[in-house]
Each structure stands twice: as C-alpha cells, then as structure tokens.
Amino acid sequence: MKTLLGTKLGMTQLLAEDGKAVPVTLIQAGPVTVTQVKTVETDGYNAVQIAYGEGKNLSKAVAGHTKSAKVTPKFLREVRVDQPVEAKIGDSFDVSVFAVGDTVDATGVSKGKGFAGTIKRHNFKASNQSHGGQGKVRRVGSIGSMYPQKVWKGKKMAGRMGAEQVTVKNLEVAYVDPETNLIGVKGAVPGPRKGLIVLGGKA
C-alpha cells in the first residue's frame, strides 16, 4: 500500500546533478499504523484505515476502535483500494514505501484567506481608475439581466476563500530519508506549515 499521512514542514531547494536548484516541499511522513482492513465480503468495498500521530483526549469511540492496534492517533483516515491489501491490524508503513523518482498525489487543505472580493477570489478585472471611472473600482458590477429576475446559483461573487481540500497530482519524489521519515516532493503542496498531507502513490 503506497499511501502515507504526514505533516508539511515547508519548502527548500535541492541541487540537481547539473547544478540547478530544484524547489521541493519537505513532509514528515509516517509512520502510519493499520487500524482496520475492510473487504468486499465484510464491508462491501476494499479499504484500509490508517492512523498517524499521537493524539490527546481521544473519544471513547476512537480509543476503543484503535485499541487493538495499540495506537492513540491524532489523525485517522480511510484509503480505498481496488484489490484487498495483505495487511493486518497493527502493521506499520513508513517512507521506505516510496523511492526517488516515484510519482505521488498530495492532498491537503488549502490556506484560508477569509472573506475575499471577486478580484482576488475569481480573478475579475478591476474597473477604470481614471478616464471617466466612477470610483467603483473593485465592485462586482451586474449580477444578472433584466429577465429572468433572479441571480443564478453558482454566480461568482465575493465570499470565503480557501480552506478547501485540494489535490495536486503527479508530483515527483526528489528525496527520501527513512531514518528521519522525511520525504521531499518537487513543487508546492497545498496547505500551511504543520498541515496534514495525504500522500498517495501509484501502486
């Protein structure tokens, strides 16, 4: 199973063999522990539930659910798989499941930007600031026509921006260190520092 949970540490650079600086995102990934294995026969689908981190003040439901795996997780995630996985409750996986050159998908929650206007949120164009401009530089403008007399659902307007789940696909693994559980992927990964990242590899 090539899926890990990790914590985003930030970005840095690695020097390639040709001397070019390669931007990479460092992630403290794993180890993760299997807390439940689901199969088509018992649950109707194939999946693996994995735990990551050390949690505090767990609810009785979570504590009882993870007791057999002997973990007190901070994060618990379920990963669907096509075929049944040969893993047992209590098994652990670390960054050694990945190698330099592998391709992974990174899923995280993007940084929240708060309430944002249409120019920042939807890349609207600002109005003229001179040449007869009326001072309504950053306003939305018309939000509909005379008929039908309504605003269509999904109309791009101001509102809360960010804090949404984002997946960046096909990132190349540039660095792996099993001793410190560090993995570096080329490019940017969604979310703030210390944010949870789900790394999914191509099996």
Regions found by a protein language model. Give the residues of each.
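Extended basic (Lys/Arg/His-rich) segments that typically form rRNA-contacting surfaces
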Residues: 1-203
